[in-house]
Regions:
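C-terminal output helix
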Residues: 94-95, 111-116
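Conserved phosphotransfer microenvironments
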Residues: 20, 42-45, 50-78, 88-95
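Non-catalytic signal-transmission and effector/linker regions of two-component phosphorelay proteins
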Residues: 1-37, 43, 50-51
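His-Asp phosphorelay/catalytic-motif detector in bacterial-type signaling
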Residues: 7, 33, 53-55, 78-83
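Short loop/edge segments at beta-strand edges and connector loops
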Residues: 38-40, 88, 109
Length: 116
């Protein structure tokens, strides 16, 4: 029996290319075929949002010249329904509530690949 794996179309809004690669590798090591694009700032983000069909987005609170709040604003303005997971350094109940209230589908600690 054979079946094809579907690629997860992933957009990563991050300020570190190395850490973004680690995120992609964590998903691949978990058995998920992943096709990803990295947005290092707002210009990259807007090009990616306008030019691609994304299934999931991983986002840092700030990256380059942009922020999570800006990401959510662009998604709403462009009518994109992409689930966003916020990768938070300061993982507390307050940051979870704040991220979720701004529209994140989930909030995970930036350094915990198992929760991702």
């Amino acid at each position: 029996m054979s079946y094809a794996l579907d690629n997860l179309r992933l957009l990563i809004a991050h300020d570190s290319q190395d850490e973004a690669e680690q995120l992609m590798n964590a998903l691949r090591n978990a058995g998920r075929a992943t096709r990803a694009q990295l947005a290092l700032g707002e210009d990259d983000l807007l090009r990616a949002l306008k030019g691609g069909a994304w299934e999931l987005m991983l986002c840092r609170p700030t990256f380059g010249d942009s922020s999570f709040e800006s990401v959510m604003s662009h998604l709403n303005r462009l009518g994109k329904a992409i689930p966003v997971i916020l990768l938070e350094d300061n993982f507390t109940p307050d940051t979870i509530k704040a991220g979720m209230s701004l529209g994140a589908r989930g909030v995970v600690p930036n350094d915990d690949r198992d929760l991702l």
